[in-house]
Amino acid sequence: MTTTFEYTADDIIQALQQMQDERQRDALMRFFKTGAGDYGEGDRFLGLRCPQTRMVVREVRGRVALSEVERLIASPWHEVRLCGFLLIVEEMRRVLPTARRNTEAMAARRNELARFYLRHARQANNWDLVDMTCPKILGYWLLYPQADGTMPDRGILDRLAESDNLWEQRIAMVTNWMLIRHGQFEDALRIADRLLAHPHDLIHKAVGWMLREVGKEDMAVLEDYLERRYSQMARTTLRYAIEKMGEPQRQAWLRRQP
């Protein structure tokens, strides 16, 4: 089946701009830390709520060429970039394997979308852009065989973790969410090890969050990891990791001395 591409980046940007809200813009700029020296310094907002952006994505999904998506994620506007990245999520969803269908063409498309995302990963330059997209793009890609039958190289997570870019480092950690949900913890624990000593709070939170997700699937795995690593963790990482434990158990971890 041939896809007819009906929407351009300009069409989508116009639809988003028609909903811009100055009051909401100011609130978002504060929330996403766009001030001088903050992690979101210089980012620009139209003032859209996430459901508004998703509404546009639902309207145009499957009918936007990757070349137009590339223009969206190059935009200076946060919501336009988000829209572009969410369109990649939708494209990945369309080619996920099912019990009845998993063609070489679908596998090739998954690889194309993942590679596209990796080339533009630094444009996912705030935590929401990372968290809403990387598990459903890179995470899904890493779960399934490529067209030649081999599995994608999960060493990409290590390379992202070793990047000098904060957002690529967060991608390295948060991508594991999809793997964790499928009972695969090894990569998450390995990347957590790489990032435990990271200086930034956004990485402390990401590592703790993924450890918490491991615990939701298998508490014994989380507890074993904490026994070995809690003394090396930032306090924020530990608090996030143990958040879903019972209160007595949580307090016991918090009272431990390194």
Feature locations, PLM:
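Alpha-helical scaffold domains
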Residues: 1-258
